[in-house]
Design a protein with these regions (language model features):
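Short loop/turn segments at strand-loop or loop-helix junctions that form parts
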Residues: 67-68, 95, 127-132
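Conserved acetyl-CoA-binding loop-helix of GNAT-fold acetyltransferases
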Residues: 97, 101-119
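Short amphipathic alpha-helix that is part of the acyltransferase structural core
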Residues: 1-47, 52-61, 188-189, 199-207
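C-terminal "cap" of GNAT-fold acetyltransferases
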Residues: 147, 157-158, 166-206
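Conserved acyl-donor/pantetheine-binding loop and adjacent beta-alpha core of acyl/acetyltransferases
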Residues: 31, 43, 47-50, 56-94, ...
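Conserved GNAT acetyl-CoA-binding A-motif
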Residues: 117-142
């Protein structure tokens, strides 16, 4: 059994994700052409490596998963409002959360994508976002629509709007300013990136 926390999404862990995600090729397809998930996975692992992350609890149960990789692996991005994604960027395509997952799950998964992409020397990370009306429910924002991110969620990580069309935006996070880390050391990746996006506490005045 795998330990709790974030692990890479590969052929070996792909059966851990939710059943609806295992054969989904929405991002990998375009128009009337439907991609083969297995052939896509083989290409992604040969040209990129791990193509996402999973988050497991202490009992080895899935809490969430995130898919990402070089933008050219996701042709659907060209058809989305505000698309296509940039050629030099990795693209975060979808986030699947199970009901009851805490807010730290989606943040940990995105932090892993930021850290791993930076570790590979990628210029930037991009994602499609949607500006939800104020007071929209958490379920609507994270559990109903899984292929676009709430815009204010990406704000927390410093994503900037590259293009917009209506309420949909293509957002970009430049990775050049983040400290590089040794490849494969996921815990250190997460720690370095988390530190980069955690504000320094303001010292309280002494009484």
């Amino acid at each position: 059994m795998r330990g709790p926390g974030v692990s890479g999404l590969t052929t070996g862990t792909s059966q851990t994700v939710a059943p609806v995600c295992r054969d989904c090729v929405w991002w990998q397809s375009r128009g009337n052409r439907t991609a083969s998930k297995q052939r896509w996975i083989e290409r992604a692992e040969e040209e990129w490596g791990e193509w996402g992350s999973i988050y497991l609890d202490e009992h080895g149960r899935l809490l969430g998963s995130l898919q990402y990789g070089p933008s050219y692996l996701f042709p659907r991005a060209a058809d989305l409002p505000a698309g296509p994604a940039s050629d030099d960027a990795a693209l975060v395509t979808c986030l699947y959360l199970l009901r009851g997952a805490t807010g730290w799950v989606e943040k940990s998964l995105l932090l892993a994508a930021i850290g791993e992409s930076r570790d590979r020397g990628t210029t930037a990370l991009e994602a499609f976002a949607y500006r939800y009306p104020e007071h929209e429910t958490q379920e609507e924002r994270f559990l109903v629509h899984r292929t676009v991110f709430p815009r204010d969620f990406l704000d927390e990580f410093g994503f900037a709007t590259l293009r917009s069309q209506g309420r949909v935006e293509l957002c970009r996070l430049e990775l050049g300013g983040l400290q590089a880390v040794e490849e494969g050391r996921r815990a250190k990746v997460l720690r370095v990136v988390q530190d980069a996006f955690t504000p320094t506490p303001i010292p309280l005045p002494r009484p």
